[in-house]
């Protein structure tokens, strides 16, 4: 796109450069914040999964008992609702895990072995941790998408917009400087011509 080599355009380009320089630090700070948040979310997800894996190992004995006794009912682990809230991090709306409700049907305590309550509770804890880790994965995905967009904007400002604007300013400044020098030269030449004409007229009158 051609740039108008005028004083007004020079002023406009300088204002544009000032705007870019004002917004760039904000974008860079947002990029750093998003990166730190993603690392923190990934660390929390890893910690939650470690707890779930440890508990899952403990649950394996109950799974074996369920299989042998035939008392296992899949409805005991049916998820009724996953309660979430939402928060804003660096302008990104992300889900936050609160709790999970299970639709556990009532069962006859006299007919079901005593260990069923403990086994169901532990297995529900595992599922709850798995669901929490899933929500943390959602957070990381949303923050990651925003980080990519912000990084693209930072690169656009740093590598394209600011260098282009500086180049335009230099081009206009050089052109206007050349025009000013040319105007001074023309002025001096005009003055010299006037002096020469005046001298010649004086010589003719003698």
Curated annotation (Swiss-Prot):
Pfam families: ATP-synt_D
GO molecular function: ATP binding; proton-transporting ATP synthase activity, rotational mechanism; proton-transporting ATPase activity, rotational mechanism
InterPro entries: V_ATPase_D (IPR002699)
Record's function text: Produces ATP from ADP in the presence of a proton gradient across the membrane.
One of the protein's GO biological processes: proton motive force-driven plasma membrane ATP synthesis
Keyword terms of this UniProt record: ATP synthesis, Hydrogen ion transport, Ion transport, Transport
Top-level taxon: Bacteria
Protein's name in the database: V-type ATP synthase subunit D 1
Gene3D superfamilies documented for this protein: 1.10.287.3240
Family, per entry: Belongs to the V-ATPase D subunit family.
